[in-house]
Amino acid sequence: MAAPRVAGRTAKRGGALLLLCAAAFALPACSGSGYQYVKNGSDGSGTYFKVPDAWRIYDENAFIKSRNLSPTKAKAARAEGWTVAFDASSKPSLKHFNELATKQPFGIAEVRTLDPKERDEFSLMAMRNYFVPVDDLTQTGGELVPLRADEFTRDGGFHGLRLTFEFTLPTDKEAITVDQVSIVDAGTKEVHFLVVSCSSSCYERKKDTINNIVDSWTVKER
């Protein structure tokens, strides 16, 4: 399985199609492949990924509103980065963000500026624990099964970690599978993060689609 891509200054094969398809926030794939592209950026740079046409995409405003943040915190969240959510459920809801063992895949894509302290400390361990505190889970009795841990580097100094794991909380009988990728730039100024998760039985049924989504996570140098 291919590692998530980071496009450097030189166009990669298929890059022209991706740029054309990703000219807006979300629109159907140009080739009629059954996927729609989501993009952060408007000048040919930024972060791209694709999800199936039938999945619901929640833009940044909808996602932030669902978090019930104060006006000050909501403004800060917008200033720090970009976040969208997506849901495969036939009854999509941002409430699924708070449900780990969803019956259908649910995901988050985020681009966030790291503060000076985070830049000094951001590491593979930070990438591993970015969405779910994996290390804490194993120390508090949670059962965790690693399925994939692929480190990678790309042109322009980008590097990252693709991590897939299954876990069960001590208080829960249902296993959850998380498939995530973190990419940081050479200066460790921004983290580009994508995660898709659902119950492990759901993941087994949908793993090919989920893999297509995570593999499509592309960062183009600004």
Predicted regions and their residues:
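Surface-exposed amphipathic alpha-helical segments
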Residues: 55, 188-222
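C-terminal motif of bacterial Sec signal peptides marking the signal peptidase cleavage site
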Residues: 26-29
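Bacterial signal peptide processing site
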Residues: 31-34
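Proline-anchored loop/turn motifs at beta-strand termini and strand-loop-strand connectors
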Residues: 44-65
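Short aromatic-glycine motifs in intrinsically disordered, low-complexity regions
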Residues: 37-48, 131-136, 207
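Soluble non-cytosolic domains of exported or imported proteins
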Residues: 46, 117, 121, 125, ...
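Conserved polar/disulfide-associated segments of primarily extracytoplasmic proteins
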Residues: 62-186, 191
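Bacterial N-terminal signal peptides that target proteins for export
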Residues: 1-18
